[in-house]
Amino acid sequence: MTVNMRRIVEDLIRVEGVIGSLLVGKDGLVVASTLMDEEDAEILGAMSAAVFGEIDKATKRIGVGALVDAIIDAEQGSILMLEARELILVVITQRMVNLGLVKMEMRRASKRISEAVPI
């Protein structure tokens, strides 16, 4: 399964403007990553899972349902997160990027993840 997951996150960095991607469990453990620095991947994985979980709690609390995806915009880029079969797909982009295209590719990746992960 890990080889398939690695290929899925690698395919995402082919999108223009995407500089990194990783797949993490809701516990923050990294399943697959394209980040060169393993420590950075572990830190980003843990933080992404925590942020995703807190936003999910907030959306449920205010009555709009479970979190599906989130975009965090920063000065020099964005972090996109999407739930994929009990995992969280995280993509890091440059500032100037076609977010619609990135989200479309993330949805495709999510479908591939769902097919690869047993129910």
How would you describe each model-predicted region?
Residues 1-119:
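Non-catalytic interaction/Regulatory regions outside core domains
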